Amino acid sequence: MPRSRAKVPAHARHKKIIKQAKGFRGRRKNTFSNAAAAVWKAGEYAYVGRKVKKRSFRSLWIQRINAAVRIHDENLNYSTFINGLTKAGIEVDRKVMADLAVREPEAFGALVAQAKAALA
């Protein structure tokens, strides 16, 4: 009986990797070994990027909240505002607060007033 070789499955695997490397530059897009390494590394970068995205969005929300708090009250900053909200028993996450600050400044102003009242 002749030796069985994995030509069809191997070709399919190679095609899959080459397809994933579409859009890469140079030999990375059409040479299997280079494409395989590039696809692997791209996956690593994507994994890390998904974690970094969460951090950077939280940072953006905090910056927006801080700017909006300072617009409503010059003597108040982000940390004292959050402290005031905690003392007032208001639980609103940063994503929602940042959205309020951008889209509905009046509603955010009410939050600032409540936080300031809780601090006094």
UniProtKB/Swiss-Prot annotation:
Keywords linked to the UniProt accession: Ribonucleoprotein, Ribosomal protein, RNA-binding, rRNA-binding
Transmembrane segments: none
GO cellular component, one term: ribonucleoprotein complex
Disulfide cysteine pairs (residue numbers): none
GO biological process: ribosomal large subunit assembly; translation
GO MF, any single term: structural constituent of ribosome
Keyword match Calcium: no
Source superkingdom: Bacteria
InterPro entries: Ribosomal_bL20 (IPR005813), RIBOSOMAL_L20_CS (IPR049946), Ribosomal_protein_bL20_C (IPR035566)
Keyword Ribosomal protein: yes
Family: Belongs to the bacterial ribosomal protein bL20 family.
Record HAMAP family: Ribosomal_bL20
Function per UniProt: Binds directly to 23S ribosomal RNA and is necessary for the in vitro assembly process of the 50S ribosomal subunit. It is not involved in the protein synthesizing functions of that subunit.
The name this protein goes by in its record: Large ribosomal subunit protein bL20
Originating species: Hyphomonas neptunium (strain ATCC 15444)
UniProt gene name: rplT
